[in-house]
């Protein structure tokens, strides 16, 4: 069951590491670029943008450089404090920073934003309330505007972290360590160091989005090629363009660490 206080505490304690996470290694840097390229396609200068689950502001800096006007929201007060510290150079682009939960955006009016960006973990962390979160994110997006979101990928994560599973099976048994994860996408606290989140197949994300007033415009994996090939990406930046192209192939959508989707509010 979704526990917003737990998520807030987790990210309060995670602190500065969230700022470093997106640049700490080639995999994270490639993921950042894949996500960033999509909002460069669907957010334009002058747009009023809600960034829901902003963290300390890596994506905010990019949105500001594009000329967007940004309302910053995060469930973690500590992440918002870091955000204020890390984004002082773009303060004129930020209308406000607010503590907010993606399942309840009632402080905002219907159709208030030209675009909404919800990248990273928020949809995966709200567990059984994911539909509520999508409904709220779309409600505050104007008709014809875009919602850009990402979730953590089930199939891709199993593929990438496969070497961990034998030890998990030895400790927790097949049904809990593998069977439950594959069937439900739920990473429980027992096998994930106290951390609970939901991983998605592309089919599951697509079906959820199709229950709401929107149409899917674009979809992408993140980190389809780079995992296990980090050295090549470090040595030759041209691989980045191949990664971005490969991630958008239909057959690749389930193969990365995240699944990114762009939908248009109808």
Show the residue positions of the predicted features:
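Conserved class I S-adenosyl-L-methionine
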Residues: 1-44, 58, 62, 148-179
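Class I SAM-dependent methyltransferase "Motif I" SAM/SAH-binding loop
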Residues: 53-55
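Class I SAM-dependent methyltransferase SAM/SAH-binding core
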Residues: 58-104
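A short acidic, Gly/Pro-enriched loop at the edge of an enzyme's catalytic core
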Residues: 106-116
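A short glycine-rich, Lys/Arg-flanked "PGG" loop and its adjoining helix->strand segment in the class I
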Residues: 131-143
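Acceptor-substrate binding/catalytic loop of class I
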Residues: 189-204
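A C-terminal cap/extension of S-adenosyl-L-methionine-dependent methyltransferases
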Residues: 207, 217-266
């Amino acid at each position: 069951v979704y526990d917003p206080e737990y998520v807030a505490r987790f990210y309060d304690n995670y602190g500065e590491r969230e700022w470093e996470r997106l640049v700490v290694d080639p995999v994270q840097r490639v993921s950042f670029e894949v996500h960033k390229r999509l909002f460069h396609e669907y957010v334009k200068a002058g747009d009023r943008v809600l960034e829901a689950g902003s963290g300390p502001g890596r994506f905010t800096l990019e949105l500001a450089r594009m000329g967007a006007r940004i309302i910053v929201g995060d469930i973690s007060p500590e992440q918002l404090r870091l955000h204020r510290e890390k984004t002082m150079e773009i303060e004129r682009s930020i209308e406000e920073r607010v503590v907010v939960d993606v399942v309840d955006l009632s402080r905002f009016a219907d159709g208030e934003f030209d675009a909404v960006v919800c990248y990273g973990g928020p949809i995966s962390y709200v567990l059984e309330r994911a539909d509520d979160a999508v409904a709220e994110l779309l409600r505050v997006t104007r008709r014809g505007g875009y919602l850009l979101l990402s979730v953590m990928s089930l199939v891709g994560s199993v593929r990438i972290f496969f070497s961990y599973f034998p030890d998990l099976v030895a400790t927790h048994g097949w049904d809990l360590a593998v069977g439950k994860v594959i069937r439900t996408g739920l990473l429980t606290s027992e096998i994930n160091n106290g951390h609970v989140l939901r991983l998605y197949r592309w089919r599951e994300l697509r079906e959820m989005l199709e229950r709401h007033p929107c149409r899917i415009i674009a979809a992408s994996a993140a980190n389809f090629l780079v995992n296990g090939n980090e050295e090549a990406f470090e040595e030759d930046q041209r691989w980045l363009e191949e990664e971005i192209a490969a991630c958008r192939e239909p057959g690749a959508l389930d193969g990365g660490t995240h699944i990114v989707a762009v939908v248009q509010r109808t």
